[in-house]
Amino acid sequence: MVSKEYSRIGETLHHAELENGLHIYVDVKPEFSKSFAFFATNYGGMDMRFKLKGEWHDTPAGVAHFLEHKMFDTKDGNALQDLAANGASPNAFTSTAITGYYFESTEKFEENLK
């Protein structure tokens, strides 16, 4: 993990890249009572064409938003309900270029992160 200090604002941002290419950023703020997690992917409403194994595939409009909702489906119901029942406030959004998922909680943060 690489850490970068921002002395003018008294913060240190920690960064790591996982083997699968996912970038993780952690900003520890011990004075905060809430914890936040945010995941974003570079796939949004304008992304209706993608290349897989050298072949182009076209998708209908709205696929990114549809997938945003499908990501919360679980074998036993819905991850939004599970997070809320565990004290978190979850949500998601799809913009033109990205889809983001996030939650905040004051307790059980690590459990909700899993």
Residue ranges and their predicted role:
Residues 1-79:
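His/Glu-rich zincin catalytic helix
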Residues 58-60, 69-114:
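Active-site-adjacent, His/Asp/Glu-enriched structural segments that form or flank metal-binding
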